[in-house]
From Swiss-Prot:
The protein's name in its UniProt record: Large ribosomal subunit protein bL36
GO molecular function, one term: structural constituent of ribosome
InterPro entries: Ribosomal_bL36 (IPR000473), Ribosomal_bL36_sp (IPR035977)
One Gene Ontology term, aspect cellular component: ribonucleoprotein complex
Keyword Ribosomal protein part of the UniProt annotation: yes
Gene for this chain: rpmJ
Family the entry assigns: Belongs to the bacterial ribosomal protein bL36 family.
A GO biological-process term: translation
UniProt cross-references to PROSITE patterns, sorted A to Z: RIBOSOMAL_L36 (PS00828)
UniProt keyword annotations, A-Z: Ribonucleoprotein, Ribosomal protein
Biological classification of the source: Bacteria, Pseudomonadati, Elusimicrobiota, Elusimicrobia, Elusimicrobiales
HAMAP family according to UniProt: Ribosomal_bL36 (MF_00251)
Record carries keyword Ribosomal protein: yes
Length: 37
């Protein structure tokens, strides 16, 4: 899980979703997990 100021899709499978007011990136590739903070 990376915590970043700006979250971006890294690959085609990445999805940007908003969960409890927090932007997150979920993906099959575990390395690509991110959240905004």
């Amino acid at each position: 899980m990376k915590v970043r100021a700006s979250v971006k899709k890294i690959c085609q499978k990445c999805k940007v979703i908003k969960r409890n007011g927090v932007l997150r990136v979920v993906c099959d590739v575990k390395k690509h997990k991110q959240r905004q903070g």
